[in-house]
Amino acid sequence: MAQKGNIGVTTENIFPVIKKFLYSDHDIFLREMVSNAVDATQKLKTLAAQGDFKGEIGDTTVRVTLDKEAGTLTISDHGIGMTEEEIDKYINQIAFSGVTDFLDKYKENANAIIGHFGLGFYSSFMVASKVEIITKSYREGSKAVKWSCDGSPAFEIEDADKAERGSDIVLHIADDCKEFLEKNKIEELLNKYCKFMAVPVAFGKKTEWKDGKNVETDEDNIINGVEPLWTKTPSTLKDEDYKNFYRTLYPMQDEPLFWIHLNVDFPFNLTGILYFPRIKNNIDMQRNKIQLYCNQVFVTDQVEGIVPEFLTLLHGVIDSPDIPLNVSRSYLQSDSNVKKIATYITKKVADRLSSIFKENRKEYEEKWDDLKIFINYGMLSQEDFYDRAKDFALFKDVDGKYFTFEEYKTLIKDNQTDKDGNLVYLYANNKEEQYSYIEAAKNKGYSVLMMDGQLDTPMVNMLEQKLEKSRFTRVDADIIDRLIVKEDAKKTDLTDEQTANLSQVFRSQMPKLDKTEFFVEIQALGEANQPVLITQNEYMRRMKAMSQFQAGMNFYGQMPNSYNIVLNSDHELVKKVLADAEQHTAEALKPVLAELKGQEARLAVLHQSQDKKKPEEITQEEKDDLQNTQKAVNDEKQKRDNIIADYAKDNNIVHQLIDLALLQNGMLKGAALDAFLKRSVCMIK
């Protein structure tokens, strides 16, 4: 006899909330339905194991059946089933109090509803206009019953014709959700959410190629493996088992470096396998490869709140019943179990890396280039991971040799300590472009690190804070004798006038490059060093690089690139240029320099006179006189600079020296490079 009624009065608001707030994530309904079927099957197995069920368990397969013509999707199990009383208890009456408070709390975070307080079943109404439950309990003498509801609080329950125990959940798919009547869509969702559920899940039959087409066989198409690798005892597994499982998870990925098998049952339950992938340089492309499961049911691959951010670069699976199927981000951030899990995983990762380093240093070094970005990311983002990793993190020098932090400190402390007692770490980020700078450092007996990774700039900044009395400088940041200052630098013996003239010779001929500034300086570097070098200030270069990582540093990113053109006043060619410039410009400069000298003397007198007066005591005539004299000085300097520039533009040695320095830094390109090559040929003839 049919019975009609209303689902418990406290549920009147639930259906609109499900429809409205869960609509954007309605795919999860299938996970909930299949998960419930698996639970019912598992409960029957438990009852049988305890002796509370004496019958035959039989086929435990959960079946998902699609009937496009009828517009239905059915999930069937042979689990414990339900009596009419149990339907009333678990379906008609939702077993929690304070539903209004609950809805107010979670309406802005819809995912938190499903999975709490027995609401998982109701996710079916996200896609169905009507839901039917046809069920028969495992209990002796139970009658089969059919429950139906159209999404309103009203329901109907009646006797049903069902011989076998278990439940069939029949979803009549709504008109606006017809995509869930497509075979490919259901296969996609089953593969996503149910791939490792603990009992077999069948969807249709397997097919085989016969008579030029695919035809169905009698064999069930089982979409899941019921005993995934992470549920097995590590001691029973071989390396090939882990590699095969990785290929199952990530068919298109390269073979992993190594892995960690997690297995803990106190103070929380956690199993899983984490793989170290061969990480490429782009960190952002590597995230969201860890899959989170709850009792073998897929939850999410957005695990930032569950594992520390740097561990999201790992691949693999984490399974924990202590993390609910559906949780909000704020829940993850505050839950004590989640925090313990994050700490545990971090420690296990550090322990695994440390053990590989200690047990097989050679293998560890071979894998360092792939591990480096991961370990650096961890050290930058987690203080406790830095404390562990500092003992197995490595430096790599330009010759491909590896050192721990402590080993490298011991290596360089005698030769690379400056006059102020600071240990100077020299590094390069491009061996080819910085070759001559690297060789100059080696000729001094210095060691040069290779730091060409995506995170090396912030890593350098951090290490300068962590390592006592230490600083890092790129090998092309200055001339070699000023990278590690052992004693006061030798002074150039040029006069002020010679310094100004020589600087203008080269300054006037520097190329006009976009967002680039050149500053000329003169140093006495010795006859054996290069005549002209280009260096880039370490601080400014590093700040520009850091602007790509940190918000609020855009100011540095917008600034032009600044380079120093260092002229070696001891070099024969530079001396030749200066002597030639003095000879060819002497006559033209003579009256200009004489006038300049006179105007500068007058300007000095005017400044001296006005400096003795208060601002209000200086007359307008005196102010004008000072301004006009300053203008006259500037005009004469401009005349001098123009004369020198006119000379320099036709001096092939000047252009050749500049271009050689630019070429050394990879800055000579296009038409300028072509002109350099042609000039070189002409000078050789």
What kind of region is each of these model predictions?
Residues 1-180, 188, 195, 590-595, ...:
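GHKL (Bergerat-fold) ATPase N-terminal catalytic module, capturing the glycine-rich phosphate-binding loop
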Residues 113, 131-154, 174-178, 184-685:
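GHKL/Bergerat-fold ATPase module in large chromosome/replication-associated machines
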